[in-house]
Amino acid sequence: MIHGLHLTIAELAVVVGSIVLVLARWLPPATRGRAAAGASVVTLAGAAGTLPDPRWQILMVLVADLLIGAATGAAWLLGRRRARREDGPGEQRGGDLRGDGQSEQRGDGPGDLPGDLRGDLRGDGQSEQRGDGSGGRGTRRRDGRGVRARWWVALPGSLLCAALVLGGGVAAWALPVPTFPEPSGPSPVGTTVLQWTDQSRDEPATRDDADRRTVVVQLWYPAQGAGAERAQYLGRTRREADVVAGAVAGYLGAPGFLLDGPTRAYTHAVTGAAPAEGRFPVVIFSPGLGGVRTQNTAWAEDLVSRGYVVAGVDHPYDSAAVVLDDGRTVKTRIAATGDRAEGERLRTAWTAVRAADLRFVLTQLGRLDSGEIAGPFAGRLDTARAAATGHSIGGAAAMQAAADDSRFTAAINMDGGLNPGQGPLRQPVLALTHEVRDKADAEFVTKVDTVLGAGGATSYRLSVPGSAHLTFTDAPLYLPPVPALVGSLGGSGSVRMTEATTAAFLDATLSGRAVDLRAKLAEYGTLSVHDH
């Protein structure tokens, strides 16, 4: 992938070659044929390099090429037909009357080549005119491609093809296949996906009394060595990634193909790699409403490289789509009601469900560490040093889980709204909030400060200039760089900010490393500290 352009070399060849093909119609006759021929070779070679699975943006460009090819072929055929008509049957009869069986040929070129092709071959770019006394009036000039349409006929087609080529190129840049930044720590990263059922809880989203709450968890962990095959993003397989991306797009009201890029991405983790020796602090992550367990993969992998285990949680019937071990896909049942009071009630209810999910996952990680659940993680997971973390409603759920369960020794809220009425927090908290731009943002920050101020440990709120709600996720790596959508920090800048601030906080609170936390956080924005 070419940095900055978000195109592979093959894709760039398709786009550049197609631009030249569009422009070739308007070049001087002496260069038109050579430019079109060269561009055709480049485009075909690039197209072959995108097979067998070209991105939809490149398909747009190739449609333009097909239109150009069809128009060129039609012009050539029309030129041949016109040449035959202008040769006329009379000359054939003249040859027959001479008795030599030969038909008379016009011009100086071979066979029935259009006159201006002969001109092009001579290099003078001139079209040969038939001597019928018309002076060419009412005719179209013909070149080496046959009949050349008048400019006002060709212009709309050229503009359409140009729009397809440029539109495809811009779309490929704006909606790229994400490239994940290299983790900053020394440890290789492994990953695996687990599914657990909490037999003590009913599934609140169904009416089946026998249905129990099930969660899907992706673990990222320090591994013994780097592997050759990197893990698929958004799912265990490409098919699962396609399902999840389509569901996320549908939840946002967008067509699924717009999120084609993330389904093609691979991360730095290696699926099933052997865990490294040692015991590592645990970080449990809850995604945003309609989000999925992998939405903060870049952040998770960076923390793991620094010596943490991260567990990303899918919440069935809340996450956009959760693919279960039996192949079933559970999609979200949460939708906007238009009623503010009802919306707040649902938000509170699902925050509680998510908080219970996080507590259950912490319990299961403890069972993995003890060997009660068989697997390679026995003795690796230090659940006595555990942080509840999340984004958006996941951040609120993390705060609720920490308030409800003292086993969590720290908490991180990434731009999640908090209810001042929730229970007090006894753990240190880091709250990352987007830039304050209006009254609603100011009210949002005030509620967060109220909760942090009521806690029992020193907590921090960092307002990050240039950030938006999705800045704290992987979204800046694959969504258009629209500040209102993903902020203005850039893809890698957004990821590095989230990694640096949260890692400093976890180093200070879970790992006991010497960190000037206040100074480190203040590097990235406006810091408010709630001392206790």
Describe the function of each predicted region.
Residues 5-10, 31-82:
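Membrane-embedded alpha-helical segments of integral membrane proteins
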Residues 170-283, 491, 502-504:
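Domain-level recognition of soluble alpha/beta enzyme cores
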Residues 222-224, 233-258, 294-340, 465:
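Active-site machinery of serine-nucleophile hydrolases
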